[in-house]
């Protein structure tokens, strides 16, 4: 059984465009970098070089800020006053159940189509989310190939036992999507941060840094510690795209679809909570009739509350 995906949901297209328009004016620019083997890997004095492909950004920060402010104005969000390369974080708020994962995966495809960006890393806080993202990539494969004219792309879950996938990520000129758990690269003891023979004597993270990848952070509120922020910044991102329904910090927010918006647009169902009524409950208001007296002016009753 194949799942059919709706490709023209207005709010999803708006969320995608709110990211892609940040780079309006960017020309396709693929930069090449050289990876040189270390001395230990040289054979008979011959140096074996590899050529990697990195994301290249031509826009200045003033261009990014101008594009960002136009998006924020259009979407009724607070305008960012200043921005710099170290602060290229952009937040998308989407209510649970509205297709957040689909949106950021399709955003990847659009960024590749429009600007030629090829290196993307999806950072997740847990194994469950990691497996969920990979599954979504599997079931959307035919859908995206149809939408994007059989665009060739590779996706994989980072595995510390398969370091060669990092080198392939760096040298491939096809669209590359890596999924990685934050715990796999936020400590010095992680394999990715250590020199390895499989990586020609380099630390595998050095390959990633040279790629200048676009980072997508899924559920960033779970990765707001200083250690997590430092780890993500060491990937040398071109920019960081943050997707959640419950952001702790909304860095340069570009799109908002909260629970109220989702309900008003009939994207999620309303939950009704019924009141609880106890049967045979003796814990009710107490009243006791003490006496009744007939008088000339009427009837008097004495009660105990």
Feature roles, as predicted:
Residues 1-305:
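RecA-like P-loop NTPase motor core of helicase/translocase proteins
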């Amino acid at each position: 059984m194949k799942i059919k995906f709706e490709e023209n949901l207005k709010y999803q297209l708006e969320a995608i465009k709110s990211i892609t328009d940040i780079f309006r004016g960017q020309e396709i620019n693929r930069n090449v970098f050289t990876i040189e083997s270390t001395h230990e890997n040289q054979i008979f004095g011959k140096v074996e070089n590899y050529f990697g492909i990195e994301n290249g950004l031509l826009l200045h920060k003033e261009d990014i800020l101008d594009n960002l402010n136009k998006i924020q104005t259009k979407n009724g969000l607070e305008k960012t006053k200043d921005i710099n390369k170290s602060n290229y974080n952009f937040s998308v708020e989407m209510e649970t159940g509205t297709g957040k994962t689909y949106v950021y995966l399709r955003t990847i495809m659009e960024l590749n189509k429009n600007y030629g960006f090829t290196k993307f890393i999806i950072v997740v806080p847990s194994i469950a989310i990691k497996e969920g993202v990979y599954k979504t990539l599997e079931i959307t494969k035919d859908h995206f190939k149809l939408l994007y004219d059989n665009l060739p792309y590779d996706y994989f879950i980072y595995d510390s036992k398969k370091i060669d996938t990092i080198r392939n990520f760096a040298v491939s000129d096809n669209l590359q999507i890596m999924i990685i758990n934050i715990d796999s690269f936020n400590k010095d003891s992680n394999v990715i941060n250590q020199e390895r023979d499989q990586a020609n004597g380099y630390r595998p993270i050095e390959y990633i840094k040279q790629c200048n990848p676009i980072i997508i952070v899924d559920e960033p509120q779970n990765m707001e510690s200083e250690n997590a922020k430092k780890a993500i910044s060491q990937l040398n991102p071109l920019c960081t795209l943050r997707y959640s329904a419950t952001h702790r910090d909304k860095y340069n927010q570009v799109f908002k679809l909260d629970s109220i918006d989702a309900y008003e647009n009939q994207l999620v169902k309303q939950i009704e909570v019924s009141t609880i009524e106890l049967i045979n409950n003796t814990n009710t208001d107490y009243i006791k009739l003490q006496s009744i007296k007939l008088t000339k002016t009427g009837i008097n009753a004495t009660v105990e509350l």
